[in-house]
Amino acid sequence: MSNYSHSSNNPFLKVSTKEDKPSSFHKIAEDEEYEVTSPTDATFRASKNADNSAGGNNPLESGRAGESGDGIRFGRDPFGNFQGGAEGQDESSIDPNGFRPTGGPDHGFPNNYALGRRTSVSAESLNPTSAGSDSWTPPSHPKSEEQLARLKTAVSNNFLFSHLDDEQSRTVLDALVEKPIPAKDIKVISQGDAGDYFYIVEEGHFDVYINPSGSVQPGPDGAGTKISTIGPGGSFGELALMYNAPRAATIVSTEPKSTLWALDRITFRRILMDSAFQRRRMYEAFLEEVPLLSSLKPYERAKIADALDTIKFPAGEYIIKEGDPGDAFYLLESGEAEAFMEGVEEPVKSYKRGDYFGELALLDDKPRAASVRAKTEVKVAKLGRDGFKRLLGPVENIMRRTEYSSRPSTAT
């Protein structure tokens, strides 16, 4: 294996060059930057010879490229707290070459580790519960009632939290850390960097930039093209944690004062991904019991499971109403429901666990032909129009063959 490597692709190493152009973003001094991004400090053991202050060519991290004395030190955690021995290291002990092509025991890395290459994040198991027998305890950061109220408002509409039960929600809220962003044009995460934290926006707006090269480049336009803006209640940073991949975009603050809440990688995977994994397993088991879907392959049912949303209705509440446009398909998970038609006093159909309704209004693009009301408290799995069209194609003919005389609900 060749020892040659490109330092520009390595998120842990910075090489200063005289040709680098100044950044269009504000430089943030190390002692006051409130740095919110970090390579995974715990991934590698400490090395007394590690490069800690080489100049950066990342315009969103180091400000003006080429100022090697002001580069980011990796001895701090994502919240600006010093964690290692890098800060007090004698400048004379730092390798003037700025990088080492390969690792080795002397450098604190494996012999075959190429420092010049971009590194991937160390992956946990895809099944977050696979290590559930250990003694992991979720972090807990005390919060005032006012902070909790603000935080609950911030996460109330976030899709990643919509399926958590009360205990899981409380664990996540306790683990979140408030992160004030004190100025405009502060880089929160950089494309291509390792991902350690997931962020929720409470206050302020943040622009999203993507560079086609896959990482931030030198120069005023090194962040790439702006593709969107994230506002209060939004979130970012989950993809790198979910898929153990480098950051997919650069996020920059746009207002003089903003507030984020940060959730660390381990808690994110243990709580949010564990919830998603268990939810998929639950739905897969449920879908296997639905006669309509018995002909589907396991991977097809898994796709449906990922697309379902759980909704609860109290007894007496209408799930769908006659005459309304058809926008979703429903599977009854628990409880009992009944279908009614205008002019008919008695229910025209009863439902129990495993039954479904709402399909023909989607198949034929017609209004609902009947109303469905919860007889008891019910829990339904809802599949939206797009997911229905995309995922239930293999059983469309089965649904169309069902006779209305024996199953009037198919017209709903």
UniProtKB/Swiss-Prot annotation:
Modified residues annotated as Phosphoserine in this record: S120
Gene Ontology MF terms in the entry: cAMP binding; cAMP-dependent protein kinase inhibitor activity; protein kinase A catalytic subunit binding
GO annotation (BP), single: adenylate cyclase-activating G protein-coupled receptor signaling pathway
Polar residues composition-biased segments: 1-11, 49-60, 119-138
Keywords: cAMP, cAMP-binding, Nucleotide-binding, Phosphoprotein, Repeat
PROSITE patterns found in the cross-reference section: CNMP_BINDING_1, CNMP_BINDING_2, CNMP_BINDING_3
Region annotation (Disordered) ranges: 1-146
Binding residues annotated for 3',5'-cyclic AMP 1, in chain numbering: 160-291
Renumbered residue ranges of the record's region Dimerization and phosphorylation: 23-159
UniProt keyword Repeat present: yes
Basic and acidic residues compositional bias, start-end: 16-29
PANTHER family per UniProt: CAMP-DEPENDENT PROTEIN KINASE REGULATORY CHAIN, CAMP-DEPENDENT PROTEIN KINASE TYPE I REGULATORY SUBUNIT-RELATED
Subunit structure: Tetramer, composed of 2 regulatory (R) and 2 catalytic (C) subunits. In the presence of cAMP it dissociates into 2 active monomeric C subunits and an R dimer.
Assigned protein family: Belongs to the cAMP-dependent kinase regulatory chain family.
Name used for this protein in its record: cAMP-dependent protein kinase regulatory subunit
Underlying gene: pkaR
